[in-house]
């Protein structure tokens, strides 16, 4: 099921680097904070599982990126939990228009709490962004030792840590 707005555009469509939801809000003169507060109720519907989004990269990423940008973990947790419980196939490793997965995006924002949630729900730690950087490399650039150690531990468990020997 795809969610459509009044304009007929689908929420996951990308137009000029923004989702159609963001584009429509900006066309109507809304700023970032206003956009967030105007759609937070919609995010609540999505996170409660009343609205099911299709699995396009743009849709999953746009919903996750709002939670990442605002640091509000509850909509993100609820979205991922309901996606898993409802056996939906939204791709947690989908890339946005800039080549970032949600985990890479969280690492670029140095948001370790969001990264832990994404990893819990199956985010792949080995996927590179468009610049060829992995989440562990991105956290390392910020000097976020706690995040780097956590990701290394996860990679050790998965048996993939040899990919990251020279990142710190």
From Swiss-Prot:
Keywords: ANK repeat, Repeat
InterPro entries xrefs: Ankyrin_rpt, Ankyrin_rpt-contain_sf
This protein's record includes keyword Nucleotide-binding: no
ANK repeats: 59-88, 98-127, 131-160
Keyword Protein biosynthesis appears in the UniProt entry: no
A Pfam family matched in the record: Ank_2
PROSITE patterns membership: ANK_REP_REGION, ANK_REPEAT
Protein name, per record: Putative ankyrin repeat protein RBE_1411
Organism: Rickettsia bellii (strain RML369-C)
């Amino acid at each position: 099921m795809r969610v459509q707005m009044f304009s007929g555009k689908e929420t996951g469509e990308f137009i000029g680097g923004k989702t159609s939801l963001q584009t429509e809000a900006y066309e109507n003169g809304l700023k970032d904070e206003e956009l967030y507060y105007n759609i937070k109720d919609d995010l609540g519907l999505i996170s409660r599982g009343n609205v099911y989004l299709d699995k396009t990269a743009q849709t999953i990423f746009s919903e996750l990126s709002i939670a990442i940008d605002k640091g509000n973990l509850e909509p993100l947790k609820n979205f991922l939990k309901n996606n898993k419980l409802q056996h939906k196939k939204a791709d947690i490793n989908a890339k946005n228009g800039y080549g970032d997965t949600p985990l890479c995006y969280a690492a670029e924002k140095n948001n370790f709490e969001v990264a832990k949630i994404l990893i819990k729900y199956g985010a792949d730690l080995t996927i590179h962004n468009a610049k060829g950087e992995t989440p562990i490399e991105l956290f390392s650039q910020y000097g976020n030792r706690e995040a780097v150690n956590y990701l290394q531990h996860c990679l050790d468990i998965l048996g993939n840590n040899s990919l990251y020997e020279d990142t710190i």
